[in-house]
């Protein structure tokens, strides 16, 4: 095994997660720095480079001990060039992220979407367990995802593949989505969507635990819904089944097209575990082709906040392997 390390970087709206990884994907060290949004995020690459230098010195290592940087970022990305067209939460617009970071660090940089690198991380070292055909669905404030086919992330013609949260599941009369459409999966299966559905129904279920929670706190959360469902509250169980129906329906349609080996559910909402997973699987099996359903295994994501940095390491590994194969054919 090489003594040199991969660098994984996961850029978020409030923090940037960073890690050194062995070539086997084990985290040697991990840390966070604040996301500096001043001047439209112009100083982020400098902050990353400075943080790398500082951390390297603590390990008595130098840049020559690093193989490259794999970075996940939000927003619309030109995958080949690492150019960020627009990342609302960061402030980047028409930002040459790959070029700037390579200039600052003097290391090769590979850039991909943050949801995609989380999928790669789970595939490599997490719930995907090495599966070369896998779906990752992240349920948090929004609904995101990544599609791994034959060991590679599907990007599509302009980087938009994997926008699972914007599959239309309610064609008419659905709630408005942040994307501008209505009835997207995100409007029902995100933490905010789950809370909205529960809140809209409490007036008709005044004896439920959720109605008591709402009267007490004036607000409901997805966590409240799953806690009440775990306590066998009938209304909460009906809300969970409602959102699981749409998730199972959407995932089945994806699976019928992609035939995945693993379907991994991640994000904060996935902490509900089997309370959510069991009804999703029931509805999935109702809409998936039997052979597709037989080949797919549902799993809860295991890497948590480490998925992105581990996936960043995989990007470097993948590029390193392709370069070695290229040299062999010359």
UniProtKB/Swiss-Prot annotation:
GO terms for molecular function: ATP binding; glucokinase activity. InterPro entries: ATPase_NBD (IPR043129), ROK (IPR000600), ROK_cs (IPR049874), ROK_glcA (IPR004654). It catalyses: D-glucose + ATP = D-glucose 6-phosphate + ADP + H(+). CDD domains: ASKHA_NBD_ROK_BsGLK-like (cd24062). It is an enzyme of class 2 (transferase). Belongs to the ROK (NagC/XylR) family. The keyword Nucleotide-binding applies. One of its GO terms (cellular component) is cytoplasm. It is found in: Cytoplasm. PROSITE patterns: ROK (PS01125). Its EC number is 2.7.1.2. Keywords: ATP-binding, Cytoplasm, Glycolysis, Kinase, Nucleotide-binding, Transferase. This is Glucokinase. The gene is glcK.
């Amino acid at each position: 095994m090489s003594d040199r390390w991969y660098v994984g970087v996961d850029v978020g709206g409030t923090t940037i997660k960073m890690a050194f990884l062995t070539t086997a994907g084990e985290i040697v060290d991990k840390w966070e720095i604040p996301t500096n949004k001043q001047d439209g995020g112009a100083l982020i690459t400098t902050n990353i480079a400075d943080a790398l230098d500082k951390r390297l010195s603590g390990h008595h290592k130098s840049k020559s001990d690093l193989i490259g940087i794999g970075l996940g970022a939000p927003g619309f990305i030109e995958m080949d060039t690492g150019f960020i067209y627009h990342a609302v939460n960061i402030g980047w617009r028409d930002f040459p992220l790959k070029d700037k970071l390579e200039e600052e660090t003097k290391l090769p940089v590979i850039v991909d979407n943050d949801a995609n690198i989380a999928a790669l991380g789970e595939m490599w070292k997490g719930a995907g367990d090495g599966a070369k055909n896998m779906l990752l669905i992240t349920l948090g404030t929004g609904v995101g995802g990544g599609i791994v086919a034959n060991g590679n992330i599907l990007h599509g013609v302009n980087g938009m593949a994997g926008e699972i949260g914007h599959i239309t599941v309610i064609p008419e009369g659905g709630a408005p989505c942040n994307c501008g459409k209505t009835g997207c999966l995100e409007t029902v299966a995100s933490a905010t969507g789950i809370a909205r559905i529960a809140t809209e129904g409490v007036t008709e279920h005044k004896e439920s635990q959720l109605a008591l929670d709402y009267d007490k706190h004036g607000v409901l959360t997805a966590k409240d819904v799953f806690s009440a469902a775990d306590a066998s509250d009938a209304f909460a169980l009906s809300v969970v089944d409602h959102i699981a129906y749409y998730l199972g329906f959407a995932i089945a349609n994806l699976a019928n097209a992609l035939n995945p080996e693993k379907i991994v559910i991640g994000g904060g909402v996935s902490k509900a575990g089997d309370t959510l997973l069991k009804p999703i699987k029931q509805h999935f099996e109702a809409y998936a082709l039997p052979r597709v359903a037989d080949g797919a295994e549902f799993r809860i994501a295991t890497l948590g906040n480490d998925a992105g940095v581990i996936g960043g390491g995989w990007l470097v590994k993948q590029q390193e392997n392709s370069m070695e194969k290229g040299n062999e054919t010359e």
